[in-house]
Curated annotation (Swiss-Prot):
InterPro entries (alphabetical): Seed_Storage_Prolamin (IPR051529), Zein (IPR002530)
Coiled-coil region list: none
UniProt lineage: Eukaryota, Viridiplantae, Streptophyta, Embryophyta, Tracheophyta
Entry protein name: Zein-alpha B49
Keyword set, alphabetical order: Repeat, Seed storage protein, Storage protein
Length: 122
């Protein structure tokens, strides 16, 4: 609010009029938080990857219990499209699974022809 009052007021107007705010408040608030921290985290990741990972640790215990889930979440934090579009998140998640698919190991061309589970994205 102090850095850019116009942007803050605009954001407050968007918050109060969002249908997601009414339907699923926790998800909406999480999305708003991510939109605010993504630029800062991205700059920190480029300037100092070690500090970036260290900064994420207090917010995320997945690094200890499940490194694969942590890396997946880290990729989503760095990609604003994932925050804005859940279909992009689903697509990226499937792309991460493709290397473990037997089709992709035997024949990469076949792996791309496999249907996407959970509905069409395109």
């Amino acid at each position: 609010a102090m850095v850019n009052p116009a942007a803050y007021l605009q954001q407050q107007q968007l918050i109060s009029s969002s249908p997601l705010d009414v339907v699923n408040a926790p998800t909406y608030l999480q999305q708003q938080l991510l939109q605010q921290i993504i630029p800062a985290l991205t700059q920190l990741a480029v300037a100092n990857p070690a500090a970036y990972l260290q900064q994420l640790l207090p917010f995320n215990q997945l690094t200890v219990s499940n490194s694969a889930a942590y890396l997946q979440q880290r990729q989503q934090l760095l990609n604003p499209l994932v925050v804005a579009n859940p279909l992009v998140a689903a697509f990226l998640q499937q792309q991460q699974l493709l290397p473990y698919n037997q089709f992709s190991l035997m024949n990469p061309a076949l792996s791309w022809q496999q249907p996407i589970v959970g509905g069409a994205i395109f």
